[in-house]
C-alpha cells in the first residue's frame, strides 16, 4: 500500500462540513466517491486534518488515503481534480510515509475569518463573508486580540456542551487587518489546534469588543473564568476559512 497526502481547497457553501454524514453532502464523501471511481469500485477511506463545519471553506485542507498501487503523482492529482465536483480542487498530491496521519501528525493550523463591515453588504460575498454592519473601533480589536496569543485553557471559547476534556491550546499568532478596497476585516489565527467553534467564538467576542459592548480586557476575563457565557455570540460559518496546515519536520 502507498500512502498519499493531498492538499485541497473547497467552497464550503454547499457542504454540511468535511466529515461524512448519513443524510447530508460532505467533502469527505465526495472525495471518497471520486476515489472509488478511479480504483474500479474499491472503497477508499479518506482522513482529513480538520473537520470543518457546515458552510466553512478551505484553501489548504490536508487529507491522506492509501492506494494498493503506485501512481504517477500529477496524473493522480489531475484525475482527482477533474473527476471531483467543481467546488473541490486538488492543489497537490505527494507520497508520504506510512506513519503520516493528516490529523495526528504534529502540525499547526491557520484559519482566516472574513467579516464584511460594509453598509450595505456585498451580496456577492454572502456565502463567503459574515456581515457585521455596526460601528467598530479597530484599535480596540487589535489590542484585545493579542490576549489570545499563548497557551491557554480555551473553555470559554468553545461550544457549550463540548465533550473533549483537554481544552488547552496554543495560539502562536493572532491578528486582524482592514482591507479598505473591499471593506473587510480579516482575522487570522495560527495555533496547534482549535476547539469546536473556537475561532468563530473568538471573532464574535472581538467584534463585540470593537463595538464597545465589551471591555478591551474581556478576553483575559474569559480565559480566567472559563465561562462561555462571558464570550460573544457565534458568527455564521460562511466567513471562516481553513487557510493552511504546516506539519513538523521529523
UniProtKB/Swiss-Prot annotation:
Q: What does this protein do?
A: Formation of pseudouridine at positions 38, 39 and 40 in the anticodon stem and loop of transfer RNAs.
HAMAP family per the UniProt record, alphabetical? TruA (MF_00171)
> What family does this chain come from, according to its entry?
Belongs to the tRNA pseudouridine synthase TruA family.
Q: What is its EC number?
A: 5.4.99.12
What does UniProt list as catalytic?
53 (nucleophile)
Tell me what organism the protein belongs to: Streptococcus uberis (strain ATCC BAA-854 / 0140J)
Q: Which GO terms describe its molecular function?
A: RNA binding; tRNA pseudouridine(38-40) synthase activity
Q: Where is the signal peptide?
A: none
Q: Which UniProt keywords apply?
A: Isomerase, tRNA processing
A Pfam family (short name) is PseudoU_synth_1
InterPro entries referenced in this protein's UniProt entry, alphabetically: PsdUridine_synth_cat_dom_sf, PsdUridine_synth_TruA, PsdUridine_synth_TruA_a/b_dom, PsdUridine_synth_TruA_C, TruA/RsuA/RluB/E/F_N
What's the protein here called?
tRNA pseudouridine synthase A
As its record notes, the protein acts as a catalyst of:
uridine(38/39/40) in tRNA = pseudouridine(38/39/40) in tRNA
Highest taxon listed in the record's lineage = Bacteria
Ligase is among the record's keywords: no
Q: Which GO terms describe its biological process?
A: tRNA pseudouridine synthesis
- Residues that hold substrate according to the record: 111
How it assembles, according to the record, is: Homodimer.
